[in-house]
């Protein structure tokens, strides 16, 4: 039962009768359910137009107003407060959740395809924690958009044509790959060694330029040769390691799109030619595109004078292909790429294409001394995860919840994935964040373990009863419910609304914060309401239904954030 929607529809009709206009109704939630479950200030908004006091308007709206699922409607000093009939609402909510199971929270198909690009790190070394923020937010958005009814295709844009990849190929020709290392780490080591060699011998720079030029020419002419093979092997070797890291964090891309595809297909050349014809390109040290009509002072670097393309041009070609194959596109980009992302979008507009939506995220860092790094320069996502798992193992052993080494490992891995993913996704992307272990692995207040532990608590309760036999009970919730019962039922009912809102505004942190609020609400319910030891059978069965429903909603919420439940903690 969508009580909120029923309230809005009923008030809209009353307002239409009073004003002859369709006016958007906004509902607020009072700080305590004792003051009402929902309220509206619509009477204040209409006061000037109707030339009446808000109190009088509120009374006119509420007179003879009846809404299914609402037990009491109160007009108080111009505000209209709605009190739900919790006996009806609780029964319908818990039965719906138990009926829909893993589908509770999901919406009908919207018949819109989304291409969501995330991660897209250069294949020249392992993912660092900055990439981690991109991949976690991106994958969470994919899951949420899917649940909201969109058809989502996730893409990883592989930069196989830039200077950085040419340096990797150059390095592979001179240094032996350390096959004892994970492949992306081995590539990273070669990249560092090659850069050092280039810094010490400036005359070798021409070799990098030649590699880039020869690779692009081969791609443009559809030629497979020794150079193309070297680039392909280097990139694929790095991607093998990338995919391992992504899989560890429950992240999988639908498609890996190579940058060179657009050179090979001729689309990049087509983009350059079309932009040259706009009359907005100037020949300087390179060809530059004037975007001043969009309020951008800096010019987009289009191509080198020798005709070879640049990353920005290939990016435009990639986005043209995206836009031709979806209803809208979403990109995850670091804040340091803000100008570049906007410039690519305006170039698309110049060519008659829709712009991509961009979710920008700020930097992520670790407190100094929180963990050591064997890389010396940055913390890789692999190191971050291993450290999380090590700390989680210690906690699992301390709590004595697992008997075998395999069980300890399985629980620790799920806690570690949850700690890393949740601690990243709960913070708004536009805010810089510091990854703190005391928050990530917090079992008491803000960490994912709080949510996982609430779920484990639900599981333990349900092990001692049979909730499946309760769904047909006719007298569920037919008693005076406690405040903590009402609060938790209201919370579990909100998942569909939360998913819809998170998808609409592209903010997975809304769902993350909801999951924590739900876990905290359940803990209060558990601490204040007897469940299995409750003597009244109706009350006991109703509370078991709340436990089972909460367990399902917690599972569904964390699943949309790419996090699994350990089962016991």
Swiss-Prot record:
Its EC number is 6.1.1.19. It catalyses: tRNA(Arg) + L-arginine + ATP = L-arginyl-tRNA(Arg) + AMP + diphosphate. GO terms for molecular function: arginine-tRNA ligase activity; ATP binding. It is found in: Cytoplasm. The keyword Ligase applies. Pfam families: Arg_tRNA_synt_N, DALR_1, tRNA-synt_1d. It is an enzyme of class 6 (ligase). A motif ('HIGH' region) lies at residues 121-131. GO terms for cellular component: cytoplasm. Keywords: Aminoacyl-tRNA synthetase, ATP-binding, Cytoplasm, Ligase, Nucleotide-binding, Protein biosynthesis. Gene3D superfamilies: Arginyl tRNA synthetase N-terminal domain (3.30.1360.70), HUPs (3.40.50.620), Isoleucyl-tRNA Synthetase, Domain 1 (1.10.730.10). SMART domains: Arg_tRNA_synt_N, DALR_1. One of its GO terms (biological process) is arginyl-tRNA aminoacylation. This is Arginine--tRNA ligase. The gene is argS.
């Amino acid at each position: 039962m969508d009580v909120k929607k029923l309230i809005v529809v009923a008030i809209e009709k009353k307002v239409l009768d009073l004003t002859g206009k369709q006016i958007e109704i906004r509902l607020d939630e009072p700080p305590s359910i004792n003051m009402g479950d929902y309220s509206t200030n619509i009477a204040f908004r209409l006061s000037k137009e109707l030339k009446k006091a808000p109190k009088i308007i509120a009374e006119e709206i509420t007179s003879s107003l009846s809404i299914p699922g609402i037990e009491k409607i109160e007009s108080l000093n111009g505000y209209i407060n709605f009190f739900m009939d919790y006996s009806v609402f609780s029964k319908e909510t818990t039965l719906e959740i138990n009926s829909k199971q893993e589908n509770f929270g999901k919406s009908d198909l919207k018949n819109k395809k989304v291409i969501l690009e995330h991660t897209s790190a250069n294949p020249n070394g392992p993912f660092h924690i900055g990439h981690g923020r991109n991949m976690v937010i991106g994958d969470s958005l994919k899951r949420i958009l899917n649940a909201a009814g969109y058809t989502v295709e996730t893409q990883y844009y592989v930069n196989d044509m830039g200077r950085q990849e040419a340096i990797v190929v150059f390095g592979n020709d001179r240094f032996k790959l350390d096959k004892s290392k994970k492949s992306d780490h081995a590539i990273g080591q070669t990249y560092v060694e090659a850069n050092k060699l280039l810094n010490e011998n400036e005359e070798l720079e021409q070799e990098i330029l030649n590699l880039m030029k020869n690779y692009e020419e081969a791609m443009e002419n559809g030629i497979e040769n020794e150079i193309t093979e070297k680039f392909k092997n280097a990139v694929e070797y790095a991607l093998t390691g990338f995919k391992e890291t992504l899989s560890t964090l429950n992240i999988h891309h639908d498609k890996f799109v190579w940058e060179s595809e657009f050179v090979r297909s001729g689309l990049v050349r087509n983009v350059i030619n079309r932009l040259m014809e706009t009359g907005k390109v100037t020949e300087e040290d390179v060809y530059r595109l004037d975007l001043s009509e969009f309020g951008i002072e800096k010019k987009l670097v289009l191509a080198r004078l020798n005709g070879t393309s640049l990353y920005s041009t290939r990016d435009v070609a990639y986005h043209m292909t995206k836009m031709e194959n979806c209803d809208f596109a979403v990109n995850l980009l670091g804040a340091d790429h803000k100008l570049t992302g906007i410039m690519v979008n305006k170039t698309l507009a110049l060519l008659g294409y829709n712009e991509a939506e961009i979710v920008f995220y700020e930097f992520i860092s670790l407190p100094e001394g929180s963990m050591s790094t064997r890389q010396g320069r940055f913390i890789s996502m692999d190191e971050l995860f291993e450290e999380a798992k090590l700390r989680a193992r210690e906690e699992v052993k301390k709590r004595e919840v697992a008997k075998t080494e395999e069980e300890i490992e399985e629980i620790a891995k799920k806690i570690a994935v949850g700690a890393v993913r949740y601690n990243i996704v709960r913070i708004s992307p536009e805010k810089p964040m510091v990854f703190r272990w005391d928050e990530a692995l917090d079992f008491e207040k803000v960490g994912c373990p709080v949510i996982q532990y609430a779920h484990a608590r639900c599981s333990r309760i349900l092990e001692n009863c049979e909730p499946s036999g309760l769904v047909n009970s006719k007298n569920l919730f037919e008693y005076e419910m406690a405040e903590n019962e009402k609060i938790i039922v209201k919370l579990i009912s909100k998942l569909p609304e939360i998913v819809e809102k998170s998808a609409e505004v592209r903010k997975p942190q809304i769902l993350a914060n909801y999951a924590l609020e739900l876990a905290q609400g359940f803990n209060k319910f558990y601490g204040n309401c007897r469940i299995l030891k409750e003597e009244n059978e109706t009350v006991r069965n109703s509370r078991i239904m709340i436990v089972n429903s909460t367990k399902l909603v917690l599972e569904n919420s964390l699943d949309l954030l790419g996090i699994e439940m350990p089962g016991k903690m």
